[in-house]
């Protein structure tokens, strides 16, 4: 790999960002400022200069297209890189899925490695089935998906209950969790939540299943609460953060 050629392409500001090794580095990059170039250069710098294995990096993007572009640029610069080495390069849900399938002990949660992903419509249909079977009293069924997401958020925060909930929503949420486990299925939300849960259980241990050294994030300004929590899970294990974003394009 010709690292010097990649280095020569960077301007002084980009070089400063690429070589920054602080616990967390946030790079403000507007449209057309060479964001993908900086991300790729950071990955190459860590691998070639700091000798960090590609496997020990997590690269998080919001689309498969963005992840593919980073991989393609990486391969052009380093033809020796293999798909296996970049299996942790992808969307938030995709990376969480890969970690659960290949590196994290999902068996401790009651799942097997061949668990499937439950689509949102399937979860909603299951919820309605449980309501009918268990004769649950649920208000605002037309907003059930949103209410279940809120119940999950409140539960994760450790609160006593869903504010203003005067029905069986919490019972339904518990039954849904049990049924998903019985079917060996996780929702997209479960992927990040369970990956974080398993990494937290290993916090402080000398040998960890994930053992990620760097988290590199594209379009960080678009992260919602769950995605930020996912990033925090890696940092709690000792990983450093390098994030690139455009503050003028904030969605959340």
Regions found by a protein language model. Name each.
Residues 231-236:
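Conserved catalytic/switch belt of AAA+ P-loop NTPases
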Residues 96, 249-252:
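Short gly/pro/ser/thr-enriched loop/turn and capping motifs at secondary-structure boundaries
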Residues 1-28, 33, 37-40, 56-58, ...:
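Accessory N-terminal region flanking or inserted into the helicase ATPase core
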Residues 100-112, 126, 154:
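Acidic/polar active-site rim loop that often engages polyanionic ligands
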